[in-house]
């Protein structure tokens, strides 16, 4: 926060989001296109998800946030499936065992980017268990970024979204 305050004195247009820990300067009235769905398994994954969502918005995408829809309460995910299926790309952020990316990969026909998080307990191993689950997924169309890499997922999702927007315009 101290870095933000110092920078904000020199650049008053700088904003800081304490949840995602993103510091940014954005153009006003930015045009956004397409749609990316950013989903979390649990509420503990929201910080990384917000990093992905805000990165995608910064680079020009519309983002639908769908939080706390993990496999332990699959009915919550299924109740939001129609919205998720409209997206050009889906970002699945999950700690613990990381199953959300595989489940989404089996339910949607769009690319899914798995983001393992370091949250969890027991044999979570700082996100390694979620990472291994995601990279060993048998669901087609699932790609995985590194542990807690919301920025990387948001940027990649934006590139995929642009391809979808281009296809819609053609």
Spans of model-derived segments:
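Glycine-rich oxoanion-binding loops at beta->alpha junctions
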Residues: 22-24, 62-83, 128-129, 145
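Short glycine/serine/threonine-rich phosphate/pyrophosphate-binding segments
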Residues: 45-50, 74, 94-103, 124-125, ...
């Amino acid at each position: 926060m101290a870095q933000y305050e110092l920078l904000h004195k020199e650049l008053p247009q700088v904003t800081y989001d304490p949840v995602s820990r993103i510091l940014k300067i954005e153009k006003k009235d930015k045009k956004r296109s397409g749609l990316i769905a950013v989903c979390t398994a649990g509420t503990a994954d929201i910080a990384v998800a917000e990093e992905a969502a805000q990165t995608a918005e910064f680079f020009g995408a519309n983002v639908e946030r769908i939080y706390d829809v993990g496999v332990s309460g699959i009915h919550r995910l299924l109740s939001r499936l129609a919205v998720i299926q409209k997206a050009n790309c889906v970002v699945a952020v999950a700690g613990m065992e990381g199953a959300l990316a595989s489940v989404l990969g089996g339910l949607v026909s769009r690319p899914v980017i798995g983001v393992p998080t370091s949250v969890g307990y027991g044999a979570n191993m700082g996100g390694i268990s979620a990472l291994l689950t995601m990279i060993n997924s048998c669901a087609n169309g699932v790609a995985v970024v590194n542990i807690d890499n919301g920025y990387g997922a948001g940027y990649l999702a934006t590139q995929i979204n642009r391809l979808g927007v281009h296809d819609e315009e053609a």
